[in-house]
Amino acid sequence: MNYPSVSEQKHRVFIIYSAYLRVQFRESARLAVSVRNKNYNLVRADLHNILPQKNTTVFKDGTLAPLLIRLAWHSCATYDKYTRTGGSNGATMRYHLEASDEGNVGLEVARLSLEPIKRKHPWITYADLWILAGVVSIEACKGPSIKWRDGRVDYEDDLLVPPNGRLPLGGGDASHVRTIFSRMGFNDQETVALIGAHSLGRLHHHRSGFDGPWTSNPAKCDNEFYKLLLGNVWTLVDSPTGRKQYVNSTGQVMMPSDMSLIEDANFRFWVDQYAVSEELWRDHFALAFEKLTELGR
């Protein structure tokens, strides 16, 4: 058998490597042009386009918005002000350690839904895209406009993934809620305002263990969550998975952590305020959510 000479082998390697460099150069040039031409308004438009969902078996309320808000929320809520770790930077939920946190079950659907937009606009980081998706979703559900700025980076490995257990748990009491939110840097007023996002979406037993909608219109961002907390008789029942949850006569549900907002005097003060004034809640929620998106930067 005749083997190629050393010079022939080198020539073949050179040809292959040259072809590889040409491909890399074209890709780098494409990305460079893309970055120069980056347009967040186009990304926003594409995000709006993916929100309506015809498959009401999977998306009972006909929209992807609540799930994208949850993705944005949870990607920020790992922040620890004491160690200055976690938060919206890094898009660390791409890695198994964070993706496997019990609080993030089901969010792979949200992440995968954003992949076509990421491929279309490769210049935007995952970290920025996830947060922008949440902001756009709030606005699409008639919620307040949220100030948003870019500049988040994607971590190249999982070395800076925050530990599991930092997300709020639905079965927690007022002490748990206050501990989790104060660790992120929120006071009681901001905490209650942020939890008002439970006006959107619904609980799924295969994700959280709880089941049912919080409000009568899970696709509308308003202050109904607070009104329902105060204006209903809530009965403690078992969810399909055996977790304790509260239900009213019309089928809305609350988790123990939700009910803690009217059991704790300091939290209750703000529930009362927001139930009366949607405008006040919208103003406070917009500021608190903006603060949430900036954690860890």
Swiss-Prot record:
EC code: 1.11.1.-
GO molecular function: heme binding; metal ion binding; peroxidase activity
Annotated site location: Transition state stabilizer: R70
Domain of life of the organism encoding this protein: Eukaryota
Enzyme class: oxidoreductase
Main function: Destroys radicals which are normally produced within the cells and which are toxic to biological systems.
Name of the protein described by the UniProt record: Putative heme-binding peroxidase
Species whose genome carries this gene: Yarrowia lipolytica (strain CLIB 122 / E 150) (Yeast)
